[in-house]
């Protein structure tokens, strides 16, 4: 019936919406109670109790237009219809619920009637049971004491039977090797036999049991001494012997001695593996040394590359796995068994006073520390064999596994120093790894410079900056055979190789601080390892090494430049300058971001490293200028010292050495221009190549070399020359060089011309010797002025050379300027 009267619109969401609207209308909350709201006194509030329809209608007529009134009427009609529909729906629903509730109440009445009948029946049965129980208790009241006595006698007889059968039972257990059952049976009867030992029958049983238990104890001791017993059997033996009142201290020593023999076997296996690995390494090393046709030393060569791991029979991860799975696991099992037997075992009253747990705990600590020290020494020996730094992940994973497995000992044996000692081994391994990486980077840098030197030692760099192909990875691949690398290419390759190798090293070292590594959350790896280890010990040390090793090329070279190619000095100076401008900041920023370096401890600032790199670059560039200047000076000195300037013939050509000087200077200009910017020059005159020689024929030199040359003329010319020097600008020959091409060439030319000047001052010239010097100086002036920052510098030095030659000339008759120009143009 209820289903027939249910309206078709029975959607739960629709019903909830209707209920909420009605509750809102009647002012009810969710629990169906009227909400306590302040009554509205507004007669225009249609929902208020004081609503006055007349006032409300008058207000609407005043405030609203006809259209608004009609709309308001339509809205109210819709609301009334909606509420009417909702009310009908609720009436239908409540009617159905009322009918359903009536049916439910009718069913409950029928059920309760049946339940009352069953309860009456149960009450009658309980009364009958109570009456029957009272009747039985009354009947047995007189025989209760007799039954209790008979039960006690029966129990005593069973105990006596157990005592009389005990020797046979113990012998049977001894034959079946059921030692635990025998000990348990004897412990149950021991107190009774001891109490009634004065009775002959019990005394005999006690003696027989004592003999049998002595045999059992002897077998347990023998089983305890045998090395083939498992850990479970060993623990059972110890527990049974303790129950047989064996001395606890002696049992501790025997247990640890037996366990030590097994652990010693594990350590000997690890040590044998170390020896096999050492033999394998020695054999592999001898093969490498004697291998024929090995490639030249280069970073890409597998023979000398420090980033390749040496061949070994077993890698370190397998070694650590074996140590953890065998030694550490067995040690943890021994600790757990020992603690369960001697330390955590409940002590009986007579044993509690002997402080067995304290004694056993002390012996256990000594035992664990001794064996762990031997194990740690083997682990450190194996870590030290990891000389190659090619694959750092194996070492980090091995150290992580080593550290992780040692944490089990800290849980089993609180207060043990073994876990902290293991952490110290990991820390030392990380420090040693950083040193190895630093050494490998240094070796790689030296090998890279060897490649550069080989590339420079092949057919020398032409004026275009190209050279023949050299060996090693820096020279390039197959394309390098057709197009030898230029200085910029060598610089770029060297810089990229160093930077990429350093990034690779940082990525390898970063494995020590990975989130999945257990020891990475230790304070050392969060602080000191990142700041002092990686940043200072690796990155900063490597940058300082680059600067220091570069400066050594200046210190080791002699006055003639040693064996270091000048192009290498120039390239290294540019490399250090690039480090000062950008590379150092980039590397340190990368390191700080990658390792989250916390600058709690003093670290080297970027500015200090940049200053050191700039100092190295300045020193290298100064030395390059000095070396190149001395090379040209050597040619000029030999050309002056090996010539007879008094008896020479009349000059017809420019000397070949002057042409060589100009050619070498031009080559140096191109070479320096490949790596450094042009620089700033002073404004040049349009006739610089000629104006210099006009200085030679100036009024001062006309006074010097006039045909009316008299003995007093040298005094006048000397005076004028000295006065001219007083007012001329001082020239510093070995002044610091700026990082540009013009400054470098200026320094080289100053050294060369100054040497030329000093050599001229030491020689004596004839007439044609002076004229040859004039021709040579004019030729130099025609070409050298364009290389320097200030052409007046060249004018002054060449003027000094000609003037010194005139002072040292026996017959100072200068050549006509036009003749000099013709000879130089023809030359």
Swiss-Prot record:
Looking at the record, which segments are called Disordered? 279-304
Query: Which stretches does UniProt call biased (Low complexity)?
Result: 291-304
Q: Where is the composition biased (Polar residues)?
A: 279-290
Write out the GO MF terms.
small GTPase binding
Q: In which tissues is it expressed?
A: Ubiquitously expressed in adult.
Q: Where in the cell is it found?
A: Golgi apparatus, trans-Golgi network; Recycling endosome
The record's section on InterPro entries has:
Cullin_repeat-like_dom_sf, Vps51
Top-level lineage group: Eukaryota
The main place the protein resides is Golgi
Name the UniProt key words of this record, in alphabetical order. Answer: Coiled coil, Endosome, Golgi apparatus, Lipid transport, Protein transport, Transport
Q: Which SUPFAM superfamilies match?
A: Cullin repeat-like
Q: Which GO terms describe its cellular component?
A: cytosol; EARP complex; GARP complex; membrane; recycling endosome
Q: Which GO terms describe its biological process?
A: endocytic recycling; Golgi organization; Golgi vesicle transport; lipid digestion; lipid transport; lysosomal transport; protein transport; retrograde transport, endosome to Golgi
Which positions are tagged coiled coil? 99-131, 254-278
What does the subunit comment say?
Component of the Golgi-associated retrograde protein (GARP) complex Component of the endosome-associated retrograde protein (EARP) complex.
Record's PANTHER family?
VACUOLAR PROTEIN SORTING-ASSOCIATED PROTEIN 51 HOMOLOG
User: What is this protein for, i.e. what is its function?
Assistant: Involved in retrograde transport from early and late endosomes to the late Golgi. The GARP complex is required for the maintenance of protein retrieval from endosomes to the TGN, acid hydrolase sorting, lysosome function, endosomal cholesterol traffic and autophagy. Acts as a component of the EARP complex that is involved in endocytic recycling.
User: What does the sequence similarity comment in the record state about its family?
Assistant: Belongs to the VPS51 family.
Q: What's the protein called, per UniProt? A: Vacuolar protein sorting-associated protein 51 homolog
Can you name the source organism? Danio rerio (Zebrafish)
Q: Which lineage is the organism of this entry classified under, starting from the top rank? A: Eukaryota, Metazoa, Chordata, Craniata, Vertebrata
The protein's gene is named vps51
